[in-house]
Every structure is written in C-alpha cells, then in structure tokens.
C-alpha cells in the first residue's frame, strides 16, 4: 500500500515496484525517496511459470521497476519482463527498468564465430516488453548502453566507493596505489587515481582461455607497487579467481597491503573462500545484489547503493540531470557512505 507519493510536475506520480530478487534494496530506495514500494502479488506456478499483478492502479504513473539480474538470473530477467508487460497493459505513463546489475552484460561482443551477443538481447527484450528507459550501475562495458533504443542512465558506484576508501586511508592517501586487475580496465583505475589525489597506477597482466569460463591467470604486475597500499578495483566479482590471483601477485611484488573494491558482489562458487584467503586487508562491495549472511565475513564491507539509485530516480522523475549527480557527489545527497 502506497502511503506517500512523491510530487513532481502536476499530474505526475512516481511509483516504485520490485521483483523478488532484492526487495531490501527497493525498500531502502523507497525510504530515501519518502515513499513505499507498491505492493505486488507475485508467485510461481507448479510448472515454473510466473504470475504478477499490481494491487493498485498504475494508470498515468511514472513507474520504476527495480530488479537486479542475480541468481537465478534467467528467472530474475523474466520476472522483470513480465512486470513491465503488466505495467504497459495497465496504462503506466512511463516505465523505467532499474537493473542495478544487468544480466549478461559481460557477453557484449563476439569472441568467436557463431556466438551470441547476449547483452544486446537483454536490452531488446526489455524494450519489447515495454521499458521506455533503463537505469543500471557499472555496466561491464559502458558502450553497451548503445544496444538500447532509448535513454540509458549508466550510473557509476565509484563516488560511493571512493568516498569510503578516502575515509579509510585518511592521512595516508599519498601511499595509495590504484590497481586494475587487467589492462582493459586501466581507464577506470585512472579515474579512481584522480579522485584519490593522483597517486600511482598499476595493472595486473593476465591471460584468459576463452574456451574455459571463469578462469584467468594473473601473471605479473605492470607498475611499481612495492611498499604501497594497493586498492584493487573491478566492476564485478564472480568466482573471484581473477581478484584472488591479482592479490597474490601484488603481494609478491612487495605491496604493503591490498584492499579489494568492486561494485557487484556476485560471489559464485568458491568466491568467498578465495577472498578470505587471498591476503586482502579488506573487501569492499556495494549491495547492487543481495549478499546473504552466510557469504559475509569480518573482512567484508558492504556499502549501500540506495542513495545513488534514489537520487537518479528522483532526477529522472523531476526531469533533472542525472549527470550532475556525479559532478556534485557526495555533496548532492549529503549522506556520505551508508552500510548495507
């Protein structure tokens, strides 16, 4: 039941709905916006098909459908598609698919012949279902937002994470080196270094067999990290093979400490054990996907992405600028970092 409606221009109503993957994040976003999540009836039939129905009218509303594409990923995507279809048929004024983690984003190009570009397919499915706009956090490749025929708000968690790291290393930022886990993300590492005061950069050279998923070998460090507090930054940690290997290589190269930072903590299979035993001082993630208690440990810090999502949703609803959020963050939302 909606107890409050965010008022924008006349005759505009904002409604937030959520799938079943990460309702806690939706509740946190709603709290930031000063509204409640619209109640939704959703359940599975015996054969695995899903049913969705909204308990109140959405006619003429600007609706934001929050669903992280997390395990079971195909079910998560399908549920969001069904939710969007129901909104379109119920005459919602506009529909924004809020996908903190967009599924299949790593399959954004063909490595070999006869392969799909699954990321493009997900964008096409969202458009066909009725999404007018997509909002996501740290796509694996920023250019993949061009797959969608419509506006895409590509949010970045870097301000949230940098704010935390700056606080953790207060007084010692001059000894921080930013490290990319591979050459492909060196541009992101450069942006990190600029925000942290222009410290040194390094990257880990790795090799990957494209015929064997979730396997990469970290070979050597390119750059001087001896005696440095290394901040190892990535967009997503899945099985943690790349990150754990990079930690070991950095330690072998004489790093004083290694702090692992990533936006999406998928943490599949052996990831937790690898991260616990990789020698990292701390692992810092955001809550774009749910991280259950059994996957948490003393060395893990989870920051809330809800203030960033709420600010972006508010900007879209009020016809404001999403880009300006990142020019003024954290001053814009005034909350620093929150823990999830």
UniProtKB/Swiss-Prot annotation:
<comment type="similarity">
    <text>Belongs to the ribose-phosphate pyrophosphokinase family. Class I subfamily.</text>
</comment>
<keyword id="KW-0808">Transferase</keyword>
<feature type="binding site">
    <location>
        <begin position="106"/>
        <end position="107"/>
    </location>
    <ligand>
        <name>ATP</name>
    </ligand>
</feature>
<dbReference type="GO" id="GO:0016301">
    <property type="term" value="F:kinase activity"/>
</dbReference>
<dbReference type="InterPro" id="IPR000836">
    <property type="entry name" value="PRibTrfase_dom"/>
</dbReference>
<feature type="binding site">
    <location>
        <position position="140"/>
    </location>
    <ligand>
        <name>Mg(2+) 1</name>
    </ligand>
</feature>
<dbReference type="InterPro" id="IPR005946">
    <property type="entry name" value="Rib-P_diPkinase"/>
</dbReference>
<dbReference type="GO" id="GO:0002189">
    <property type="term" value="C:ribose phosphate diphosphokinase complex"/>
</dbReference>
<keyword id="KW-0418">Kinase</keyword>
<keyword id="KW-0479">Metal-binding</keyword>
<dbReference type="GO" id="GO:0006164">
    <property type="term" value="P:purine nucleotide biosynthetic process"/>
</dbReference>
<dbReference type="InterPro" id="IPR029099">
    <property type="entry name" value="Pribosyltran_N"/>
</dbReference>
<keyword id="KW-0460">Magnesium</keyword>
<feature type="binding site">
    <location>
        <begin position="238"/>
        <end position="242"/>
    </location>
    <ligand>
        <name>D-ribose 5-phosphate</name>
    </ligand>
</feature>
<dbReference type="Pfam" id="PF13793">
    <property type="entry name" value="Pribosyltran_N"/>
</dbReference>
<dbReference type="InterPro" id="IPR029057">
    <property type="entry name" value="PRTase-like"/>
</dbReference>
<dbReference type="InterPro" id="IPR037515">
    <property type="entry name" value="Rib-P_diPkinase_bac"/>
</dbReference>
<keyword id="KW-0963">Cytoplasm</keyword>
<feature type="binding site">
    <location>
        <position position="234"/>
    </location>
    <ligand>
        <name>D-ribose 5-phosphate</name>
    </ligand>
</feature>
<feature type="binding site">
    <location>
        <begin position="47"/>
        <end position="49"/>
    </location>
    <ligand>
        <name>ATP</name>
    </ligand>
</feature>
<comment type="pathway">
    <text>Metabolic intermediate biosynthesis; 5-phospho-alpha-D-ribose 1-diphosphate biosynthesis; 5-phospho-alpha-D-ribose 1-diphosphate from D-ribose 5-phosphate (route I): step 1/1.</text>
</comment>
<comment type="subunit">
    <text>Homohexamer.</text>
</comment>
<dbReference type="GO" id="GO:0006015">
    <property type="term" value="P:5-phosphoribose 1-diphosphate biosynthetic process"/>
</dbReference>
<dbReference type="GO" id="GO:0004749">
    <property type="term" value="F:ribose phosphate diphosphokinase activity"/>
</dbReference>
<feature type="binding site">
    <location>
        <position position="208"/>
    </location>
    <ligand>
        <name>D-ribose 5-phosphate</name>
    </ligand>
</feature>
<dbReference type="GO" id="GO:0000287">
    <property type="term" value="F:magnesium ion binding"/>
</dbReference>
<dbReference type="GO" id="GO:0009156">
    <property type="term" value="P:ribonucleoside monophosphate biosynthetic process"/>
</dbReference>
<comment type="function">
    <text>Involved in the biosynthesis of the central metabolite phospho-alpha-D-ribosyl-1-pyrophosphate (PRPP) via the transfer of pyrophosphoryl group from ATP to 1-hydroxyl of ribose-5-phosphate (Rib-5-P).</text>
</comment>
<feature type="binding site">
    <location>
        <position position="182"/>
    </location>
    <ligand>
        <name>Mg(2+) 2</name>
    </ligand>
</feature>
<dbReference type="Pfam" id="PF14572">
    <property type="entry name" value="Pribosyl_synth"/>
</dbReference>
<keyword id="KW-0545">Nucleotide biosynthesis</keyword>
<feature type="active site">
    <location>
        <position position="206"/>
    </location>
</feature>
<keyword id="KW-0067">ATP-binding</keyword>
<dbReference type="InterPro" id="IPR000842">
    <property type="entry name" value="PRib_PP_synth_CS"/>
</dbReference>
<keyword id="KW-0547">Nucleotide-binding</keyword>
<protein>
    <recommendedName>
        <fullName>Ribose-phosphate pyrophosphokinase</fullName>
        <ecNumber>2.7.6.1</ecNumber>
    </recommendedName>
</protein>
<dbReference type="GO" id="GO:0005737">
    <property type="term" value="C:cytoplasm"/>
</dbReference>
<dbReference type="GO" id="GO:0005524">
    <property type="term" value="F:ATP binding"/>
</dbReference>
